């Protein structure tokens, strides 16, 4: 079968009406396969299908995904426990960090403040900011958070298609995998449950990037084309600066896949020389170096300031056997229908693998990985849970469950390819289209599909408190939600303090998980309901707390103190305001301190009457102190930045947050890598002085074009 390059199909009607750009895009997508057939050692024949048909597979997944998340596309805050937090974080990043030309900075928004992107990078915030610029500021930040979550979910389908094609699945099988990936819904992250139930927006944004990274790394192993190396590096960098835990899980997943690849017997008629393995290892190493270079602007500051951090992952992880039973018998990661289909496909592929069926022959040395990588990854993650210290292992096994599930569904695509092996492309693509229609008509196949909608407004009392805080909390101050079991969730949002921080655009003493880690966290907000208000008073003054929000009966004891007054009493919810001005410093005997100036990264006090000033700023290495204009060495007391004064007289103390040498060096390294990989080759090609590799790359493109003219059908 041949295809003429003039646009006329030898076996069908002419296709001149199809736009040339669409045809070329389809051809590029169809090139997502390995360059050599594992059984013959030669280039497989290309499909004679027009380019537009090759877009059908990824397109089905995109359409299904958009339909499933249509409830959050119209605007407003999406459902999700943590969604208000991401709104507040993105708002501060857009206005105070990116708006000032920085990639990171000090954010006082939560707890006692932290470097905004020290633990989890700015990937999600950058995407939200880009969308805001693209819409000329007409879209509010709550809507942008919904769009970012929807983008991460919808993009999962074409990313899964790309990954499956890299593993040698046909277009039909890869399309089925793309649709099935939308049915993976894990509350710990990945899918609709994690995105619109818990609100793990950055995690979901990282999911398609993880799949693209794995697919590109597979191609790096198989193909000498340097473009795969670049794609793998860029995608890996994107995962790392978006969700660090996902990057670690990606490494674990690819290690499992490579172990399966290495352990798979070679059936190739034309055996590759040992040097091919060395060159593949070189390309993988190059991809790793490029990824580190591209992400140096964030990785170097992370390495410079790794902690300390309090424990934040406090939930219980069940034993391995119990977890497996939950995966198989409950809706932990998918509906029971999808679980049954996955197990049936996995069993069929395992039998084909044992008997050496031709159904898996096209997968080459990836056939074992397609069958076993999902279960093996889950085992590895549980092993790491018991080995890695602190929260790292716990986060990996919880956040990695969804990625293991995405590997589990690969056998479904293999079975789909087998079912349509003798059908034409136009007929075969009806299978993923039908599956997509079933998912749309029966959304219950996707756990938590009902959460993809606009969040329900909280009770009027909480909305009133938000308006009061917006009007009365000064920029240098913060409010504290007084936690009480059974009271916090009675107003609608699971985290009312996060909703108040978002709605009032105010800082809060309440910390939030691993993404807002402060070098010091007093956890005072959890003790305010039980300790004596007189004992809490100096701590609240040091922390800059100007307002308390909590149960009316609980705050009655604070309202009796001379320094507090009620500004809102609405049923069982009360807001108290501190009468004195904010000092953001610990009160000491006979010491008089006044806050002269405040900005997120520069604070100035006037103090007298003591020989030290204990500030309300965490003792973070990038905070620098000066006394009367002279730089001094910063000290710390109880985790707080402390200035040792020369005497008890009047002094001006200033704290300044400065970018470190690692920040500047990281940006410089990234710029050098970007210039070396993208800038210099372009200049050399334009001058006609490019290296031989550039010529070989061009020859490879020409060879691809020649092969595309030969035609064929890959099913």
Task: List each language-model region with its residue ranges.
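Intrinsic-disorder-associated, low-complexity terminal segments enriched in Asp/Asn/His/Tyr and depleted
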Residues: 704-706
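Short, Lys/Arg-enriched N-terminal segments with co-localized hydrophobic residues
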Residues: 710-712
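Short hydrophobic helices that act as membrane-entry/anchoring signals
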Residues: 16, 20-34, 268
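Compositionally biased, proline-rich intrinsically disordered regions
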Residues: 8-11, 16-18
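Extracytoplasmic
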Residues: 78, 82, 96, 158, ...
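Beta-strand-rich ligand-recognition modules
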Residues: 619-622, 627-671
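Membrane-embedded transmembrane-helix bundle of lipid-linked glycan/lipid transferases
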Residues: 4, 9, 25, 37-469, ...
């Amino acid at each position: 079968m041949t295809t003429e390059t003039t646009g006329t199909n030898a076996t069908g009607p002419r296709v001149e009406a199809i736009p040339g750009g669409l045809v070329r895009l389809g051809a590029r997508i169809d090139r997502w396969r390995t360059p050599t057939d594992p059984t013959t050692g030669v280039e497989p024949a290309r499909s004679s299908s027009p380019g537009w048909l090759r877009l059908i597979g990824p397109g089905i997944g995109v359409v299904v995904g958009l339909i499933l998340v249509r409830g959050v596309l119209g605007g407003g805050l999406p459902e999700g426990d943590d969604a208000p937090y991401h709104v507040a974080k993105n708002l501060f990043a857009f206005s105070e960090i990116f708006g000032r030309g920085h990639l990171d900075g000090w954010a006082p928004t939560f707890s006692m403040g932290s470097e905004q992107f020290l633990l989890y990078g700015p990937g999600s915030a950058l995407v939200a900011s880009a969308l805001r610029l693209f819409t000329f500021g007409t879209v509010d930040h709550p809507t942008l958070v919904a769009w970012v979550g929807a983008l991460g979910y919808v993009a999962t389908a074409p990313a899964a298609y790309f990954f499956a094609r890299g593993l040698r699945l046909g277009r039909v099988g890869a399309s089925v995998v793309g649709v099935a990936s939308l049915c993976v819904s894990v509350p710990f992250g990945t899918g609709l449950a994690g995105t619109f139930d818990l609100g793990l927006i950055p995690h979901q944004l990282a999911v398609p990037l993880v799949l693209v990274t794995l697919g590109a790394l597979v191609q790096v192993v198989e193909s000498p084309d340097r473009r795969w190396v670049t794609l793998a590096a860029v995608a890996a960098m994107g995962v790392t600066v978006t969700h660090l835990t996902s990057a670690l899980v990606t490494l674990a997943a690819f290690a499992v896949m490579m172990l399966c690849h290495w352990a798979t017997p070679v059936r190739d008629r034309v055996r590759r020389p040992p040097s091919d393995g060395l060159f593949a290892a070189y390309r993988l190493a190059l991809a790793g170096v490029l990824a580190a270079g591209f992400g140096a602007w964030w990785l170097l500051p992370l390495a410079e300031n790794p902690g300390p951090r309090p424990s934040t992952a406090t939930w219980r992880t069940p034993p391995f056997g119990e977890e497996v039973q939950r995966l198989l018998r409950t809706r932990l990661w998918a509906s029971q229908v999808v679980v049954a289909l996955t197990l049936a496909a996995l069993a069929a592929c395992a039998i084909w693998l044992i008997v050496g069926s031709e159904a898996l022959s096209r997968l080459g040395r990836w056939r074992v990985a397609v069958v076993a990588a999902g279960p093996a990854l889950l085992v590895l993650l549980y092993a790491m849970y018991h080995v890695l210290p602190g929260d790292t292992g716990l986060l990996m096994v919880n956040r990695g469950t969804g990625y293991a599930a995405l590997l589990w569904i690969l056998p479904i695509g293999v079975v789909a390819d087998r079912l349509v092996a003798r059908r034409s492309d136009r007929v075969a693509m009806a299978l993923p289209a039908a599956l997509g229609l079933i998912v749309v008509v029966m959304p219950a196949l996707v756990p938590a599909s009902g959460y993809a909608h606009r969040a329900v407004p909280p009770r009027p009392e909480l909305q009133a408190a938000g308006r009061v805080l917006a009007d009365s909390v000064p920029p240098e101050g913060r409010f504290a939600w007084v936690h009480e079991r059974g009271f916090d969730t009675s107003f609608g949002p699971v985290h009312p303090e996060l909703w108040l921080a978002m709605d009032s655009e105010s800082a809060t003493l309440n910390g939030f998980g691993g993404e807002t880690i402060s070098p010091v966290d007093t956890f005072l907000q959890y003790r305010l309901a039980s300790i004596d208000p007189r004992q809490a008073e100096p701590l609240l003054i040091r922390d800059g707390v100007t307002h308390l929000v909590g149960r009316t009966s609980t705050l009655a004891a604070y309202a009796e103190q001379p320094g507090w007054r009620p500004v809102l009493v609405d049923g069982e919810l009360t807001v108290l305001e501190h009468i004195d001005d904010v000092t953001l410093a610990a009160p000491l005997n006979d010491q008089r301190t006044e806050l002269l100036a405040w900005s997120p990264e520069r604070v100035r006090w006037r103090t007298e009457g003591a020989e030290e000033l204990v500030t309300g700023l965490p003792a973070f290495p990038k905070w620098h102190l000066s006394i009367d204009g002279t730089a001094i060495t910063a000290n710390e007391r109880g985790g707080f930045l402390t200035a040792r004064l020369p005497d008890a007289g009047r002094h001006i103390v200033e704290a300044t947050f400065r970018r470190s040498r690692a920040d500047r060096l990281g940006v410089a390294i990234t710029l050098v890598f970007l210039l070396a990989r993208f800038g210099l080759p372009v200049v050399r090609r334009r001058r006609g002085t490019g290296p031989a590799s550039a010529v070989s790359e061009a020859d490879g493109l020409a060879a691809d074009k020649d092969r595309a003219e030969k035609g064929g059908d890959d099913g």
